[in-house]
Design a protein with these regions (language model features):
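N-terminal export leaders
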Residues: 20-40
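N-terminal secretory signal peptides
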Residues: 1-23, 47
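Short glycine- and hydrophobic/aromatic-rich loop-to-beta-strand nucleating segment
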Residues: 152-153, 269-272, 276-277
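Signal peptide processing junction and immediate N-terminal pro/mature segment
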Residues: 40-49
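Secondary-structure end/capping motifs
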Residues: 280-392
Length: 444
């Protein structure tokens, strides 16, 4: 009998329950190697119940802003591939309107499956409020991408005023400008989005009606600085690097960071088409785990300089790295002589439960969109939040990532939130919050 035949006979002996000790040891070693490889590819037992993601890729959109860093890092550092998703494409979008349109299309229609997105947008898209013919496209929020990190900037024509949280001097200046026959405008990035709500809140708190006293216009983030340069607007709200670039080009200055309006406020989310998540739940979990791991990496201060360098690359934001680095590392030069080192309002990707999508925060965004007429007063916010906000998937992913139980919120609410002007939002009574606001488009 040949050696080959003997080796084959030995391997088949297990069928008779007579595997030799040597064969058993070899088989055990092989199994251990396979398990080790599986753990390396899918740490935390993410796919212990199956063979891994149903598909190897997804198309994810982003806008050229620093709070998309977790997507950049997950791609650059091979984290998507680590979780079995090597074919993920992270695609730049020209505007939030483009992001919306491509989410409606889905990747099967040459669009995208998910995105770095303004937190209110999945609700506006799911409800059909901002889609063509008001046809809803169901969306899920899988994670929050960051807290804080946005700013409101004003043009250098207001340099002497050194405008900050108090808009009283700005109001007087705007009234004088309007009286001279000139238009006054405030720019944001998408109607009903976070930047729209921050600048509206700030203006209204100081008695400036954002619909009557000033014209509120939409400008894509990457076009903010160029538009301010030619005098298109008097103020704008956007994420970095555009506020710092404005200062570097001597076109304007930072009036305030949005964290000064609302400390540790939620900002962007990782949103996915519900159809993708429902069809490919394991792939969606893999994407979520990769993004969460990237958030943890971005949060570490020792990684912030590299995060800034990644952001500055041509395929991502495409700006000089000096427009990114300081604020990514927590240094805020307002362009007025005011400099804050290690700002408490710097962007957070993981610390302070930045990644968990509190449902109470989504309720605030919807309540503000009711305030400004994006939804009717009787809109059923809690019902749509229950459908769109998938904090349950976040918790599941967090457990498989090994996140400590103490770092996984026990409640879907962060409780009452207090704003810079003393207003309090109680998620148990949003109607009372609406009633407390003076300037609004809804009776409450």
């Amino acid at each position: 009998m040949s050696k080959t035949t003997k080796r084959g006979k030995g391997a088949l002996a297990a069928a008779d329950g007579k595997m030799s000790r040597r064969a058993l040891l070899k088989a055990g070693a092989g199994t251990a190697a396979l398990l080790a490889a599986a753990r390396m590819n899918f740490p935390g037992g993410a796919f212990a119940q199956g063979a891994g993601p149903e598909v190897k890729g997804a198309k994810l959109g982003f806008i050229a802003l620093t709070d998309a860093s977790p997507l950049f890092v997950a791609k650059e550092k091979g984290i998507f591939a680590k979780y079995g998703m090597p074919d993920v494409e992270v695609q730049k979008q020209a505007s939030w309107g483009t992001t919306r349109d491509n989410l409606v299309l889905g990747s099967e229609g040459n669009g995208i499956d998910g995105a770095h997105i303004l937190t209110p947008m999945p609700y506006l898209i799911s409800s059909g409020k901002v889609t063509q013919n008001n046809v809803p496209t169901p969306m899920y929020i899988l994670a929050r991408l960051n807290l804080n990190g946005q700013c409101i900037s004003v043009g250098k024509e207001y340099a002497d005023l050194k405008i900050g949280l108090d808009t009283a001097p700005f109001k007087v200046a705007l009234e004088k400008k309007k009286a001279s026959g000139k238009s006054v405008k405030a720019a944001m990035t998408f109607p009903g989005g976070t930047h729209d709500l921050w600048i509206r809140y700030w203006l209204a708190a100081g008695g400036i009606d954002p619909d009557k006293d000033i014209e509120t216009i939409v400008v894509p983030p990457a076009q903010m600085v160029a538009n301010m340069k030619v005098g298109t607007m008097d103020a704008f709200c956007v994420c970095e690097p555009w506020n710092l670039q404005l200062i570097h080009q001597n076109i304007g200055y930072t009036a305030l960071t949005t964290g000064e309006l609302w400390d540790k406020h939620p900002e962007k989310s990782f949103g996915m088409r519900a159809a993708y998540v429902d069809k490919y739940p394991k792939a969606a979990k893999a994407l979520l785990m990769a993004v969460m791991e990237a958030q943890q990496w971005c949060e570490k201060m020792e990684n912030r300089e590299e995060t800034a360098a990644i952001c500055a690359k041509r395929q991502w934001i495409n700006v000089p790295v000096e427009d990114v680095t300081d604020r990514m590392k927590g240094k805020f030069d307002y362009g007025t002589g005011r400099v804050v080192e290690n700002s408490p309002q710097q962007m957070r990707f993981w610390k302070d439960q930045a990644s968990y999508p509190f449902q109470s925060h989504d309720l605030w965004f919807i309540t503000e969109d009711i305030r400004w007429g994006k939804y009717d007063a009787g809109f059923d916010a809690k019902s749509i939040i229950a459908k769109v906000n998938r904090e349950d998937l976040w918790k599941d992913a967090a457990k498989d990532l090994g996140v400590a139980a103490a770092d996984i919120p026990a409640s879907t609410s962060r409780g009452k939130e207090t704003f810079f002007d003393g207003k309090v939002f109680d998620p148990e009574n949003p109607a009372a919050y609406l009633k407390s606001l003076t300037i609004k488009r809804v009776e409450a």
